[in-house]
């Protein structure tokens, strides 16, 4: 039962001289031929189970297949697949080959895919027949792309069938000896301006992410742990915040991702497969809260840990999770370039409503000013992480200027505003580029949203700044009222008053728009 202070004090990074993600999430567990790695449930609820042994053999076969098609160390390979076994097998094979995986979201349209495959100069892409038409549409503009591997390709011209490619390969493959700083994966991140940037991570990303993962999941692993996330594995939140750290520890993951998130189905699946660990975004959890107020009366749930990130939780959601799911939700904070660095571990510390947590042991996180000096005394500044840090990205792919701009001295700037209180808790103030400057005041939309979520009539909220001739900008709130609440002038006044009282007089929304969905 170590305390937070002890965990921080005793923490030491120990990353070996040679390190490969593919070996560490798969091969090291494959000697036990019965050890379960993945339960895959497709949209028709047909289930397949994969052991670590089978994943090792299939990924070795695919690595040989890629090799036979001239894919070598350092080549970029796009993965345009959702949560399914072939996605995982592709990742592991690419890493063992010393190539670089490029994570692509199946929700992307052709333009978004084209930019990413063009920018990364990907030599190959692995996809399914559903997304193949997008690749065909852009293929002639992608001179580097000379290999298309398709799950269930059928008799399609000009492509390789995934499982044919696997079956032709030998189960024997010697993984390339990679170092922790050797490139492993590119994850594109959208900026507020211009095109997305390719965040290039080394193999050290996985060891770098483990302290945060173990922290948020209440000292993972425990006997019987089983992970599920409704997030697509093409997001860092799906792959590196859930899938890979679980497999690193030799525990199983449920792969299930229907086209449309269905809150009742989510409860059903978690009960059926005895999910212990959940990684989710607050919006999805809110949908679950609104759909099933008392889930434990309807479902036999076994949850041990829930972590959420990507947006502010709000007190109502935390309270409901505690009361109705019997689990204290652990907020997590990070970004694609430097993930899982702040959060809570309810096992060893009290969660604080509204705060995003403390620095995860192993990471040095502070609030800095524009010159890179640490800000004291709870003042507003930018959340920053001190380098070097294993979880930190190597660079933006072929964009040295953007990489340079991300740092001030030894500090990686997140672009997020926040405060750090005297107890070491961080409070999120909003994105730097979302900050609303109104009448000389700097207002973080995140804080206003969190405050509005505490209003008895509010189900969902979004806050932006809109131009104003007098104040420069004013706060505007879009509000989805709770079921049965009729939006009227009185409610609008009550909402404004609530923020004036609960947050700050100048931060209230001067414009309120009620929405129906």
Stretch-by-stretch model annotation:
Residues 248-251, 275-280, 289-351, 364:
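Gly/Ser/Thr-rich phosphate-binding loop
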Residues 151, 501-517:
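AMP-binding/adenylate-forming catalytic domain of the ANL superfamily
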Residues 68, 89-92, 96-164, 178, ...:
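Structural core segment of the AMP-binding/adenylate-forming
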């Amino acid at each position: 039962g170590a305390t937070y202070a002890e965990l921080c004090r005793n923490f030491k990074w120990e990353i070996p001289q040679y390190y490969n993600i593919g070996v560490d999430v798969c091969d090291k567990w494959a000697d036990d031929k019965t050890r379960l790695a993945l339960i895959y449930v497709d949209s028709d609820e047909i289930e397949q189970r994969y052991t670590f042994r089978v994943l090792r053999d299939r990924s070795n076969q695919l690595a040989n297949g890629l090799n036979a098609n001239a894919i070598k160390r350092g080549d970029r390979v796009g993965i345009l697949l959702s949560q399914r076994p072939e996605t995982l097998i592709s990742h592991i094979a690419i890493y063992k080959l010393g190539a670089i995986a490029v994570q692509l979201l199946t929700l992307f349209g052709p333009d978004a895919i084209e930019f990413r495959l063009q920018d990364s100069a990907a030599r190959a892409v692995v996809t399914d027949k559903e997304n193949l038409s997008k690749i065909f549409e852009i293929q002639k503009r992608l001179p580097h792309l000379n290999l298309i591997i398709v799950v269930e390709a059928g008799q399609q011209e000009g492509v390789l069938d995934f499982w044919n490619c696997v079956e032709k390969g030998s189960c024997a493959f010697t993984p390339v000896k990679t170092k922790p700083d050797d490139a492993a994966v590119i994850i594109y991140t959208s900026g507020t301006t211009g095109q997305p940037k390719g965040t290039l991570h080394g193999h050290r990303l996985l060891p770098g992410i483990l302290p945060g993962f173990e922290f948020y999941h209440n000292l993972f692993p425990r006997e019987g742990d089983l992970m599920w996330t409704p997030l697509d594995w093409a997001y860092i939140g799906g792959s590196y915040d859930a899938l890979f750290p679980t497999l690193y520890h030799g525990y199983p993951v449920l792969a299930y991702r229907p086209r449309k998130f269905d809150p009742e189905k989510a409860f059903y699946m978690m009960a059926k497969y005895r999910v212990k660990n959940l990684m989710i975004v607050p919006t999805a959890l809110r949908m679950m809260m609104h759909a099933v107020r008392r889930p434990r009366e309807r479902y036999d749930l076994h949850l041990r840990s829930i972590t959420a990130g990507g947006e502010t939780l709000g007190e109502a959601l935390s309270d409901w999770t505690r009361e109705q799911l019997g689990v204290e939700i652990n907020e997590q904070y990070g970004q694609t370039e430097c993930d899982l660095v702040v959060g809570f571990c309810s096992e060893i510390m009290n969660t604080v409503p509204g705060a995003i947590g403390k620095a995860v042991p192993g990471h040095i996180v502070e609030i800095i000013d524009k010159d890179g000096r640490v800000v004291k005394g709870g003042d507003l500044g930018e959340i920053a992480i001190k380098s070097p840090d294993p979880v930190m990205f190597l660079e933006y792919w072929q964009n040295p200027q953007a990489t340079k701009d991300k740092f001030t001295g030894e500090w990686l700037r997140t672009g997020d505003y926040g405060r750090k209180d005297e107890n070491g808790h961080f409070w999120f103030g909003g994105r730097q580029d979302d900050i609303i400057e109104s009448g000389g005041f700097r207002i973080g939309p995140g804080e206003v949203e969190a405050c509005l979520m505490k209003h008895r009539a509010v189900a969902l909220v979004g806050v932006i700044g809109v131009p104003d001739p007098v104040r420069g900008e004013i706060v505007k709130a879009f509000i989805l009222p709770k079921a049965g609440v009729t939006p009227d002038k009185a409610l609008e006044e009550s909402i404004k008053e609530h923020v004036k009282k609960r947050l700050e007089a100048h931060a209230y929304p001067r414009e309120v728009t009620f929405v129906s969905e």
